[in-house]
């Protein structure tokens, strides 16, 4: 057993870039029967971030599960990022996480202390979220993987969906894009330690703070931007809402260096899976470069919240969230349904 093996050397795809592509996933899930239960408010038949089940007239439980291979070599940081990513689904649905269970796959070639560090990173993020870890499950596996099964609670009227955007709303993104590209560059040892720290800081930041900034505001629709990229998750929102979302390319926050690496072809495999599914679902202006398109489809790991809300409410949200992040901004608007669900200008 070794402490010197790089975690990312044991993976082909890392973070949310390891997700099965949206096209394949949709074809599988659409063929499965749907469960009928009057208390199941949100199930897998929609593209929402978690399921929602009614406990009583005052309480719903939000359930989600998320795990993936490492995108960084430091085990503690990997644990933090994986936990932040799993917790995010509850925030995106308007709830607060309460209890979590560890899911860990661990290879015999690694020293057991590395597992302990991964779990410690997850524990600290769950504690920051105000939730508890109550157990978990382990599997021996040549490829390390970690994540959480999370349960959260909310009042029925607090639940947010990704399918209720209104014409005239503006779209806000709370974290910068380019995470998948930068992780791919890091695996190829093309970026320095300071840039790695910047990217991991973005990934490990809880969406708890963005969610808290929505309290009392009229949020029409919400999701988080993860493995299907900005265009993929915007498409889910536009399609579910029966609207078109126009994205302002010049307003999108992008990690410094991501466009350069995309131009060099340093992009994760998951981007091609996303493009294969999304290629006929968006239109781009003549001024949109190929590398920018790549960034917009880049699989994000523990990305930001994507919010649809009235412009006046958006200004209040941005004034609140500037205390937590410099990245949040208006990146688009919701239009009546047009020829394409997504338009990039």
Curated annotation (Swiss-Prot):
It comes from the Bacteria. ATP binds at residues 19, 46-48, 66, 89, 136-138. NCBIfam families: PRK00943.1, selD. Synthesizes selenophosphate from selenide and ATP. Homodimer. Belongs to the selenophosphate synthase 1 family. Class I subfamily. This is Selenide, water dikinase. The active site is at 16. GO terms for molecular function: ATP binding; magnesium ion binding; selenide, water dikinase activity. Its cofactor is Mg(2+). GO terms for cellular component: cytoplasm. GO terms for biological process: selenocysteine biosynthetic process. PANTHER family: INACTIVE SELENIDE, WATER DIKINASE-LIKE PROTEIN-RELATED, SELENIDE, WATER DIKINASE. Its EC number is 2.7.9.3. It catalyses: hydrogenselenide + ATP + H2O = selenophosphate + AMP + phosphate + 2 H(+). It is an enzyme of class 2 (transferase). Binds 1 Mg(2+) ion per monomer. The record marks 19 as: Important for catalytic activity. Mg(2+) binds at residues 49, 89, 224. Keywords: ATP-binding, Kinase, Magnesium, Metal-binding, Nucleotide-binding, Selenium, Transferase.
């Amino acid at each position: 057993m070794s402490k010197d093996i790089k975690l990312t050397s044991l993976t082909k795809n890392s973070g949310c870039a390891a997700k099965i592509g949206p096209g394949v996933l949709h074809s599988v899930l659409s063929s499965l029967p749907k469960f009928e239960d009057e208390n199941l408010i949100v199930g897998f038949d929609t593209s929402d971030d978690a399921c929602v089940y009614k406990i009583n007239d005052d309480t719903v439980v939000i359930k989600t599960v998320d795990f993936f291979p490492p995108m960084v070599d430091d085990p503690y940081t990997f644990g933090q990022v994986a936990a932040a990513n799993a917790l995010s689904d509850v925030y995106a649905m308007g709830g607060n996480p309460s209890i979590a269970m560890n899911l860990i796959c661990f290879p015999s070639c690694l020293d057991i202390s590395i597992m302990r560090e991964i779990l410690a990173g997850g524990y600290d993020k769950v504690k920051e979220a105000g939730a508890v870890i109550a157990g978990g499950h382990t599997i021996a596996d040549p490829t390390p993987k970690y994540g959480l099964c999370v349960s959260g609670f909310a009042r029925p009227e607090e639940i947010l969906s990704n399918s209720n955007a209104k014409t005239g709303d503006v779209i806000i993104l709370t974290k910068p894009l380019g995470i998948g590209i930068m992780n791919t560059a890091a695996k190829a040892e093309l970026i320095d330690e300071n840039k790695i720290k910047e990217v991991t800081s973005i990934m490990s930041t809880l969406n708890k703070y963005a969610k808290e900034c929505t309290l009392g505001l009229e949020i029409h629709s919400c999701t988080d931007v993860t493995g299907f990229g900005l265009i993929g998750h915007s498409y889910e929102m536009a399609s579910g809402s029966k609207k078109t979302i126009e994205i302002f390319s010049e307003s999108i926050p992008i990690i410094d260096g991501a466009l350069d690496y995309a131009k060099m072809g340093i992009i994760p495999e998951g981007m091609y899976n996303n493009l294969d599914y999304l290629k006929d679902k968006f239109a781009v202006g003549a001024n949109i470069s190929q590398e920018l398109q790549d960034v917009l489809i880049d699989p994000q790991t523990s990305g930001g919240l994507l919010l649809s809300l009235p412009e006046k409410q958006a200004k209040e949200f941005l004034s609140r969230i500037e205390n937590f992040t410099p990245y949040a901004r208006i990146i688009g608007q919701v239009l009546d349904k047009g020829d394409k669900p997504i338009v990039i200008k």
